[in-house]
Amino acid sequence: MGGKQDQDKEAYGKPAKYDPSFRGPIRNRSCTDIICCVLFFLFILGYIAVGILAWVYGDPKQVLYPRNSTGAYCGIGENKEKPYLLYFNIFSCVLNTNIIAIAQNGLKCPTPQVCVSSCPEASWTVEPRQFSQTVEQVFYAANRNFCLPGVPGNMQVLQSLQQELCPSFLLPSTPALGRCFPWTNSTVPELPGISNTSISQSISGLLDSLNARDISVKIFEDFAQSWYWILIALGLALVLSLLFILLLRLVAGPLVFVLIIGVLGVLAYGIYHCWEEYRVLRDKGASISQLGFTTNLSAYRNVQETWLAALIILAVLEGVLLLMLIFLRQRICIAIALLKEASRAVGYIMSTMFYPLVTFALLLVCIAYWAIIALFLATSGQPQYVFWAPNSSLPGCEKVPMNTSCDPMEQVNSSCPGLMCVFQGYQSTGLAQRSLFNLQIYAVLGLFWTINWVLALGQCVLAGAFASFYWAFHKPRDIPTFPLGSAFLRTLRYHTGSLAFGALILTLVQIARVILEYIDHKLRGAQNPLTRCILCCFKCCLWCLEKFIKFLNRNAYIMIAIYGKNFCVSAKNAFMLLMRNIVRVVVLDKVTDLLLFFGKLLVVGGVGVLSFFFFTGRIPSLGKTFENPQLNYYWLPIMVSILGAYLIASGFFSVFGMCVDTLFLCFLEDLERNDGSADRPYYMSKSLLKILGKKNKGTPGDKKRKK
């Protein structure tokens, strides 16, 4: 029987053997996963080459600045003093074309467009009596400089309107994204075949989608008045996060048990509520047999079987949690002791709490570089210009080859009314354009791989620092002078390839999830129930696989930081070690998740409540020094404060979570390597020794080594 148990235990590998030379993270190590390291550096060089190629061929000005009918940019170059784009007849845009396409691709709108210094401020329409007058009299003399460039002042107004050289009407407009859009309450002239209601609705939707300029100004004003209060709120979140982690060594035990009792209480109330609902519906005779099958999920709330099923589920959860408290209380105590030890480790190595700033900065670099590449690639190519006329069926237009190439710098001489050489788009025949899709895929792959590598670097560095704390017998005397800096340099020097290997595996799974989401989005309209079910199963499987790989990678990086082995060996050793202690793993993971969730709730909720009462003026006792600013949108600084508090709390608690995981693996290794004798003493704290009923049996002089 005992032999069978030993075989079952060794199914996940043999326990770690005692090594007299082991004193924590190994210093004499060699480079690991060199092939993957070389592959990663070659990929980065290719990523840089893609960036250079995008910079050479790309032109982001077409996204940042609007274009007129000839393809010239507004706001730069010869149009530097004319930053806004005016549409002669914007209703032909909002009623016949895609507005988002207009914003992204330039013209794509059947009306002339001209760069202007300011948008029209009043309504105006050409009157019939002005047809015989000149452009100088009607437009230029009245300071209506809205005609196309080069229109002579002695041209008759009727001729300029027929050739679409000048606008026939103007509306009071507001600039948005560099374009002049009419006010929603402006008086619209009568246009044949178009109702004023449809025009007003189109303008209103257009302004809503592009956002009005005055809202942006108000938001900027709110930030200008409240930025220092937002910084104070973020500072408060930082202090609360740090205090919560440092105080865990004092209150971790009571806090964990209070949280567990709270969860038990919530489940008990849920059972009571479900029973009451079930009893009422049972007395009414409301059964699922009367309802039948329906896609209206809210209807199931009114049948007794729904509440009975919920009652059974909650009762099972309540029973499982009670059994865990009864039979796994020692392991819960071990988890609490490890949480206290993690708080102690963070207190000794305070620099680790600010390492998330390094990770955040590196992530910003990765995301910004990809965004710039994507922008330049999307705007690569030489501009194309073609002949265009508002009505190609008019006399004189039959012989004009519409949609053929032309030069916008040359004068258009034709009897076709309104014929112009306009910007159509960008060529797709260049080097970058032929491979545009492949380059974009390469850039996306680079984004995922570099982000995952940066996150892996942070995990491995923190693991190395905290492992040096655990394996220091005399704490804090034996802790290295710069544990975080040493771990950072050691990781970069020896284990870049291993981090790239783990990041690549995770990246491939994430790319597969993105492809699956893209397929689901494209086929959403034509899916049948079977297809949706299959896609849902695939997405669920990939989600589970990604979670498992993240868990495995995290523990593999801890083993890499300690022993300096390659990724595969480290992942195998970590997995085997965890499987040999699977119950402890589950208990510690859930206790830590519960505690960190409560910590985030405390920090984010506290900052959010204080921000709400302050920015809404509900703290009247504050003096003038701490007077709340008068804001247009008081919710804006509140939301920014809450978001910033969440990011800060997540950064701090991610460090704490990594500390707990590292100390846990070290604790398991300590149990397998050592036996408490003078030659093989335990490195764990006295509280852990006491919980396990173990002690170090050293000589009298050695008993003082543990603090």
UniProtKB/Swiss-Prot annotation:
GO biological process: acetylcholine biosynthetic process; acetylcholine secretion; choline transport; neuromast hair cell development; otolith formation; positive regulation of cell growth; thiamine pyrophosphate transmembrane transport
Record-level GO cellular component terms: apical plasma membrane; plasma membrane
Extracellular side stretches: 55-227, 272-307, 378-452, 520-557, 616-635
Residue intervals passing through the bilayer: 34-54, 228-248, 251-271, 308-328, 357-377, 453-473, 499-519, 558-578, 595-615, 636-656
Keywords: Antiport, Cell membrane, Glycoprotein, Membrane, Transmembrane, Transmembrane helix, Transport
Cell compartment(s), UniProt: Membrane; Apical cell membrane
Record flagged with keyword Ubl conjugation: no
Top-level lineage group: Eukaryota
Key word Transport present: yes
Post-translational modification: N-glycosylated; N-glycosylation of Asn-68 and Asn-391 is required for a proper thiamine pyrophosphate uptake.
Reaction catalysed by this enzyme: choline(out) + n H(+)(in) = choline(in) + n H(+)(out); thiamine diphosphate(out) = thiamine diphosphate(in)
Disulfide bonds, paired cysteine numbers: none
Residues annotated as glycosylated: 68, 185, 196, 296, 391, 403, 413
Positions in the Cytoplasmic compartment: 1-33, 249-250, 329-356, 474-498, 579-594, 657-707
InterPro entries for this protein: Choline_transptr-like
Family: Belongs to the CTL (choline transporter-like) family.
Protein name: Choline transporter-like protein 4
Gene designation: SLC44A4
